[in-house]
Amino acid sequence: MSDKIITPKIQIQISKSLDYTPFDIKWLPYSTKLVIAGQTDSSKGIIQIYHLTKGKLDLESEFVKENPFKCCSFGASSFASRDLALGDFEGNFQIFDLEKGMPNYEIKKAHKSIIYAIDAVGGNMNYGTPEVVTGGKDGIVKVWDLRGDKPAILLEPKGIEKNNPECWSVAYGGCFNREERNLGIGYDNGDIKIYDLRMDKLIYGENFKSGICSIEFDKKNIPLNKMLASTLDSKIYLFDLKNFEKNNNLRYEKLSDEINYTTYWGTKFIPQKRDLFISMGGDGSLNLYKYNHSDVNVTEENNKNKNNGKITLINSNMVCTQPIIGFDWHNIKLGLSCLVAFDRTVKICTMNKLNIV
């Protein structure tokens, strides 16, 4: 008798319609609540908090603000607080207190126009002070120490300002003590860069010929290990960073969808099993992959783009009718996720059998 193939299933547990356009979604850490940030039909900003209870999503609170919101992060929030870092379409950056319903830190015109990407670190780990990084349409990346009102670090592409590539994605990684912090940055012209904040030095840069929609490290508070990037032209790159410092270049595995040819708006490692990750399809698909490590030892001769591991598609499900624009894994419950899409829905999804893949 042949062994039964075990395949995790991607299942929609809850689907709820929204009366506005969502752009980002996050679980409140260590809770069954989630927050959605977006834009109303009257071009206002909206924040909604939902509570997942008894198999349904209940709206708990709602805030409408002057400018529509593009991105958000809880990375600078402590366990005790519920402070959400937000970037909006007018270039404003704020830390919004969800309990009081108002910002407790705000920088007007942090960027000249829309803030496309935001990430934060330090709020819920004992490795340095809370910081927020923002990336904008102006092509500038700014790191904010929340004890001041000026950027602690400003990274601007060289050249004529009007020709600056737009910054579409930012992510913290390698934050494993009070000094070490690294940034992954992706641009609309296909540039991917890794910046060492402690050394104040660019440690990696390469062009991948298509806009970088997302950047993510597999875990923020460990030495650099793996990094994901997704592109407009239906490609996913998984970078092996373990031997990066020793060999001074990067191995990466490329996955290209030449059948569906859909934009991958984002990729997200599963926090409890970091060899597994999902992609958010422009066609509304949610795709689950596994990265299988290579058994070949890394040397300088075989390091770059040779003898890499392999990315395998585990399962896929068309969960939305339009692009999935925001996604978040629950940090405790394996396989539990939330997402928002341009079809104006929020969904709760589960993936089973992940512990035996």
Each language-model region and where it sits:
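Beta-propeller domains
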Residues: 2-14, 30-63, 96-99
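A short beta-strand motif characteristic of beta-propeller blades
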Residues: 11-16, 58-63, 102-108, 150-160, ...
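Canonical WD40 repeat/beta-propeller blade segments in eukaryotic WD-repeat proteins
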Residues: 20-27, 67-76, 112-123, 161-175, ...
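Structural hallmark of WD40 beta-propellers
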Residues: 32-36, 79-85, 104-105, 125-133, ...
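Conserved strand-to-loop turn within each blade of WD40 beta-propeller repeats
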Residues: 38-41, 87-90, 135-138, 146, ...
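WD40-repeat beta-propellers
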Residues: 45-51, 93-97, 141-145, 192-196, ...
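Solenoidal tandem-repeat scaffolds enriched in leucines and small polar residues
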Residues: 121-206, 210
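Structured C-terminal portions of repeat-based eukaryotic scaffold domains
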Residues: 202-357
